[in-house]
Amino acid sequence: MSRFVDKLPLFDRRPSPMEEAEGLPRSGYLGQLHHHQYYQPHSNMLPLEQSPPTSTKHTSVTLAQLLKRVNDARSGSSTPISSPRYTIELGGSKPESVSSESDDHHSDDGGSEGQPRALVLKFTDLTYSVKQRRKGSCLPFRRAAADEPELPAMRTLLDGISGEARDGEIMAVLGASGSGKSTLIDALANRIAKESLHGSVTINGESIDSNLLKVISAYVRQEDLLYPMLTVEETLMFAAEFRLPRSLPTREKKKRVKELIDQLGLKRAANTIIGDEGHRGVSGGERRRVSIGVDIIHNPIMLFLDEPTSGLDSTSAFMVVTVLKAIAQSGSVVVMSIHQPSYRILGLLDRLLFLSRGKTVYYGPPSELPPFFLDFGKPIPDNENPTEFALDLIKEMETETEGTKRLAEHNAAWQLKHHGEGRGYGGKPGMSLKEAISASISRGKLVSGATDGTVSVAASDHSAPPPSSSSVSKFVNPFWIEMGVLTRRAFINTKRTPEVFIIRLAAVLVTGFILATIFWRLDESPKGVQERLGFFAIAMSTMYYTCSDALPVFLSERYIFLRETAYNAYRRSSYVLSHTIVGFPSLVVLSFAFALTTFFSVGLAGGVNGFFYFVAIVLASFWAGSGFATFLSGVVTHVMLGFPVVLSTLAYFLLFSGFFINRDRIPRYWLWFHYISLVKYPYEAVMQNEFGDPTRCFVRGVQMFDNTPLAALPAAVKVRVLQSMSASLGVNIGTGTCITTGPDFLKQQAITDFGKWECLWITVAWGFLFRILFYISLLLGSRNKRR
């Protein structure tokens, strides 16, 4: 099998265009993990260049310490730095002599075969099946056609998968699409419900509590779920606020962020926003590394990644895996799925697990791929990437009836022949889980969530009790700190997208201007009364329709929210309240803008008190409308589903508000909808604010004939009709006599069951209710585990 060597010097070399574009360090810990590896057919070691150790003493070091030593060497000495050999272990054996601090680390953790390991993640006979429905059928009772094959009721995604991953190594899960790669990563990361997953997953031979696993591990999704308007440094700093212990000073958190930025090669992009389709930001490779950084901010002991190189070019993909290799060598267990690794990436992987239709078809180091397939009768050509050959062969075998089964049986026989029944590769755990976690903390691992406050950046107190499920709090921060951090982050996002608020304000002002010019200075005639009814109905429904733009807000953040709450970054209640706090000031501005545009122009009554009540009911309408849209955003999963639901529901609310049909004319079987109509209460509130004064008269004398057939009669005839009515009724009715006052008109409209202040508070209560329902929807609908 052919290999190649990158001959570029490690120091004082010119940066490549990709490095200049993505800000990768030219020297330091990551700069020394070079682009090409020399992969020898009869050796399990990868020689790499590295800066010299400052001491020959065997000590475990963290990434931060290595970075500090390199920086100190560069800044504090003018002597040229030599480049001794640095070795990354690929197989189970170790060379006789190595001179690097990584060797010290491996030596401490049991890197050589037979020596104890600090952490061993072992999974045994993992099996997971899901119910399967016939394609194209929405009805479960649909009968199959005669020529249609009967599908099995259950589909097995994982079928007896076993293996182990160790600290200091990267285990890569490979396979074609649908082979079960992501499912296995989810199973190991405890993202599948226990009642659905069969088999066992242990760390150092012990089952682990779910809360403790969330504290010591991280899960990186395939998608880059980041706020586009935050800079790289801000994104990582907010992650530090959520994941690092509250006892850790802010300066230490900032220090950790700076170190992580250097570690990820993001120094040049630190002050660049993430960006999206409408805003230029970091490159795809940098965005991927930021996504990884968000989840490793607390320096997790276990790291699970679902295809971290997906969608990246070869150079960016290699740098991402290089970062993961550095994380593994700092003492973490790294498990990731990957579609098709290149030669260079293969040189960084320690253990491979190939899946085909949920079965294990190869498990072992990359160096054993050639003899494995040679023994199977399919030798790997010398000039071909072993993983590409393996994936192509596996895909070909899947087309055969018993192809996958044959390959899986060959793997089982190979494992039994070369590694025995235990399927182990090298060392076993030399300490208990608690001891291993304590040892990891003492090496500088940042384990978030310890209630005793003993965890810090450079925790070195070996006497401190190890964290356990009982000593680990569910959340790092108390409620009020979560509120502050979430509110601050949301305000930054809002401030950097002013166009969103400007468009909303423009919509309100344009609507108010149109209404003001149409209903300009309404009089107190019967026609003016009818025109007021139309103005109030349109105005109050407009408040709700303009709130529909709140629907995409949470939908755009949904997956970020799911990622952050999967590891208890914050409480759902904190998110709901901070979301409310950030959105409320804009509602106040919109309310005053609409009221100032319409109240005096239309000629509404009430003076100053009436104006401020009008502002209050408009604000309450915005509050209830935004709450309704927010609640729906927690229920629906896509904006294309949400908008039809919002618009149609608001149309029903307007229909049953009492404007088109009075309450006493609504059929009894629809009366319940009248009382849950969001438009009913603000509509009745402004009606009472306008017509509640008994001293105001809206129909006088002959005006009673308006909107009747008698309206066409001459004025003199109308007066004689009034005189005849007066004589008949015994009541003096003249042309100036008040026939209908404001309260009389409210009775005609059946607006009698609630006062105007009651309508105001009911509208406010709707807003609170919908936000409570939004919180409940987050509790019920944000499960991060498969069923």
From Swiss-Prot:
The chain crosses the membrane at residues 500-520, 535-555, 576-596, 599-619, 620-640, 641-661, 728-745, 760-780. GO terms for biological process: cellular response to hypoxia; cellular response to osmotic stress; cellular response to salt stress; positive regulation of response to salt stress; potassium ion homeostasis; regulation of secondary shoot formation; response to abscisic acid; response to auxin. Residues 1-17 have a biased composition (Basic and acidic residues). ATP binds at G175, A176, S177, G178, S179, G180, K181, S182. InterPro entries: AAA+_ATPase, ABC2_TM, ABC_transporter-like_ATP-bd, ABC_transporter-like_CS, ABCG_dom, ABCG_transporters, P-loop_NTPase. One of its GO terms (molecular function) is ATP binding. Induction: Strongly up-regulated in roots after exposure to salt and osmotic stresses. Induced in roots by benzylaminopurine (BAP), abscisic acid (ABA) and salicylic acid (SA). Accumulates in shoots upon heat (e.g. 42 degrees Celsius). Repressed in roots by NaCl, jasmonic acid (JA), gibberellic acid (GA) and auxin (IAA). Accumulates in most hypodermal and some endodermal roots cells under stagnant deoxygenated conditions leading to hypoxia. Keywords: ATP-binding, Cell membrane, Developmental protein, Membrane, Nucleotide-binding, Stress response, Transmembrane, Transmembrane helix, Transport. Residues 121-382 form the ABC transporter domain. It is a multi-pass membrane protein. Residues 484-691 form the ABC transmembrane type-2 domain. Residues 1-25, 71-116 are annotated as: Disordered. Residues 74-85 have a biased composition (Polar residues). Gene3D superfamilies: P-loop containing nucleotide triphosphate hydrolases. Expressed in the crown root primordia, endodermis, pericycle and stele in the root, in leaf primordia of main and axillary shoots, and in the vascular cells and leaf epidermis of older leaves. GO terms for cellular component: Casparian strip; membrane; plasma membrane; suberin network. It is found in: Cell membrane. PANTHER family: ABC TRANSPORTER G FAMILY MEMBER 16, ABC TRANSPORTER G FAMILY MEMBER 28. Essential transporter for growth and development under abiotic stress. Mediates shoot branching by promoting the outgrowth of lateral shoots. Required for salt tolerance via Na/K homeostasis, at least partly by regulating SKC1/OsHKT1;5. Necessary for hypodermal suberization of roots, which contributes to formation of the apoplastic barrier. Belongs to the ABC transporter superfamily. ABCG family. Eye pigment precursor importer (TC 3.A.1.204) subfamily. This is ABC transporter G family member 5. It comes from Oryza sativa subsp. japonica (Rice).
